[in-house]
Amino acid sequence: MWTYILIFLMGMCLSGCSTTMGNYAEYSQKPFTQITATADLLRGVPDLGQEKITIAIYDFPDRTGQRKPSEKFSQLSTAVTQGPEVYLIQALKMVSDGDWFTVVERKGLDSLVKERQLVRSTRELYDGETSAGTVLKPLIFAGLIIEGGVVSYDSNMVSGGEGARVFGIGASKQYRTDQVAISMRIIAVQTGEVLMTISANKTIASYQAGADVFRFFDLRTKALEVESGAAVNEPTDYAIRSAIEYGVLKMVEKGEKLGYWKFKKWRVEE
């Protein structure tokens, strides 16, 4: 009697899991914008008490060379995104809702210059426009340059788990944390001096839990085996974005303390 009850309960659990996974698969196909916890901190930075700071980013590469971790075989896919400079530009434009930094294009400078040459030659050839009013505006030059990149990716920094089994019924859970580190330095264009350096680390958490049942019934002539589990892995890109945004936040705070820029002071009218 208990055997049939157990089989019925396991069937209900599996049907519930299949329904949940089906709904999740449908949801995962919809695009969404992932918001980090540090994004609100960047938007909440006080207003700048001077003219906007012009800053350039030529490259912010992955310097780790780390491949995706695998216990079975080596993978060709990289563990770190190959475009971290995109997140850095987004973070700079996010400071106080874009009121702090004017970010000039340098990563795609070749494409920008070619397009400007194409516009200029087309105007001269077909429109005959050579007057000063039709000349393209000069490119904005930056006063500061940010150099650096993703400098470290350490996998399996901390791992562990626990489990128990009684009369063929067991449950277990496992966890693992990786760590990614970024480093950036701010350079003055006029002198080439490194004004400050910033480093930030972010852990990447993974968690797995499962349960299983293995029982014999009908005088040990038949066996029942059921397994169920789920795993949650924090996206690597999310961790890199968080580390970069935190680095930009610390850069703003450190630069204000060193006197490179200042927060806007509000005057209370009497």
What does each model-identified segment do?
Residues I53-T54, Y58-N156, Q179-S183, I187-M196:
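N-terminal segment of the mature soluble domain
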Residues M1-I7:
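Sec-dependent signal peptide recognition
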Residues M1, A171-Q174:
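Intrinsically disordered, low-complexity segments enriched in polar/charged residues with Gly/Pro
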Residues Q34-G44, K72-F73, E85-L88, L125-T134, ...:
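N-terminal post-signal-peptidase region of extra-cytosolic proteins
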Residues S18-E51, D154, G161-E162, Q174-E270:
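C-terminal/domain-edge helix-coil "capping" segments
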Residues C13-G16:
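C-terminal motif of bacterial Sec signal peptides marking the signal peptidase cleavage site
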Residues S74-A79, T122-L125, A164-G170, T203-S206, ...:
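Short, low-complexity, polar/charged sequence segments that are solvent-exposed and flexible
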